[in-house]
């Protein structure tokens, strides 16, 4: 069985991440504006709170992130197709997008 090619352009240098929800492909990016919008919608008190909510299996956080962090693809179709089985892939994609902000940063030892 061959793996299906992702049909949308993904700019990894910009921190974009491919995500397939059901059969709907979207590209997400953790832009500062998007993160601020998700944080505001979820009433997060800190970046740590936002990260925990996006990393977990929480319906409101997952739906908000799909809506507000999608930079390419049909976010409305992705939200409509969303099922519980998609939450792990979503959490993994959100974590990967967030990690872009920390890549190349010196470590605090």
Question: What feature does the model see in each segment?
Answer:
Residues 2-14, 32-109:
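Short, surface-exposed, charged amphipathic helix/loop patches that serve as local interaction elements
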